[in-house]
Amino acid sequence: MAAELTSTKLNAENHLLLDQPLLRLPHELARRNFKSVQRLVEREKEYVLPALKETANASLSQSQTPDQTLAALDAMISRMQGLKRKMENLQQEEKKIHAQSRKRIQHLECLHHIPSLADVKYDQWSRIRLDRLIVDQMLRSGYTESAQQLAQEKDIEDLVDLNVFIQCQRIAESLRRGETKDALQWCNENKAALRKSQYNLEFELRLQQYIEMIRTGDKGKLVEARAHARKYLTPFIETQSAEIHRAAGLLAFPKDTKAEPYKSMYAPERWHHLSDLFVRTHHELLSLPSWPLLHIALSAGLSALKTPSCHSAYTSPSSNSLSTTTSVCPICSTELNELARNMPYAHHTKSYVESDPIVLPNGRIYGQQRLLEMSKKVGCVEAGKVKDPTTGEVFDESEMKKVYIM
């Protein structure tokens, strides 16, 4: 009894390892929102305080007319009103982030009030988590509308990051279409954070603009490309000197060149590389996992079930097409086989098999006694015959063959 209770006891801390991004992202968004407020206040302070001091001194010294003083004060009031509107928008955004964080904390807190894995409340909590993981998978795969609809139907909009992934997909798609405007705007908004990034997204975007100017072959565009390189590429000379030298060499090669690395620089596939690079950079800045959470959740179970035969290049001579396609092994299924390919094999030090294994003509192996008992319970099998519980096929008992394990 004690062993059973121990095996079903819920360890909340282990479960929460998978759900760290659930709280990490709102924290990162709140931090960035606060930084935006700081920048706005600092920028306006740098303008308003000197302007106010200058206007006051000019008024006291009577070096400007009252109308000029009023105009200067009106300009400052207008700027402060603009600051107020921006601050109100940021405050509303902060309230949304805090409300979302509160819902997520409440969701995770429920786990600490569930004593056992057998508790019905755990099934309910797990269902919500599964819905979250599916929405995350759909968002990362580009099915944004379906993800939004599922989140609305399950009432988990505060538990998933819809807006973040929708913005990410929008910019990634614009890059695949050959547009850099949205991505460069995003880089400008996150300039400070990008300095700490391991990726060189802004440089790659500026380099692509340079390549597109040269691709035209127009003399005016070539002059513009050189000016573009001096303005946007030269600042990266310390970290990207090799790329900048290759970019300079690109001026001597036409777009249909076969010489590498210039052929690759002209290749349309570079846009897909930029799109993937943006997604990786975006996820890094927001502390999002590079892999879908559903894959991470499945990986432990896949590894526990995986055996060398699951990805073997050789199939058993006794196996046929029917036994392969109806396999009960989740690793061998078409849905999970590729996902499990790079997973480590399960570490089994002992094998657990029936004491009287037999093999049926279709290649499936069962314990003889249990198979006979199951066939009797079915009731629709003639005497002297057995029914495969997986495929439903019926065979004569004489067709069963003993299995010997070496």
From Swiss-Prot:
Residues 126-158 form the LisH domain. Residues 164-221 form the CTLH domain. SMART domains: CRA, CTLH. Keywords: Cytoplasm, Metal-binding, Nucleus, Zinc, Zinc-finger. The keyword Mitochondrion does not apply. GO terms for cellular component: cytoplasm; GID complex; nucleus. It comes from the Eukaryota. A zinc finger (RING-Gid-type) spans 329-391. It is found in: Cytoplasm; Nucleus. InterPro entries: CRA_dom, CTLH/CRA, CTLH_C, Fyv10_fam, LisH, ZF_RING_GID. GO terms for biological process: negative regulation of gluconeogenesis; proteasome-mediated ubiquitin-dependent protein catabolic process. The keyword Nucleotide-binding does not apply. Disulfide bonds: none annotated. GO terms for molecular function: ubiquitin protein ligase activity; zinc ion binding. Belongs to the FYV10 family. Involved in the proteasome-dependent degradation of fructose-1,6-bisphosphatase. This is Protein fyv10. The gene is fyv10.
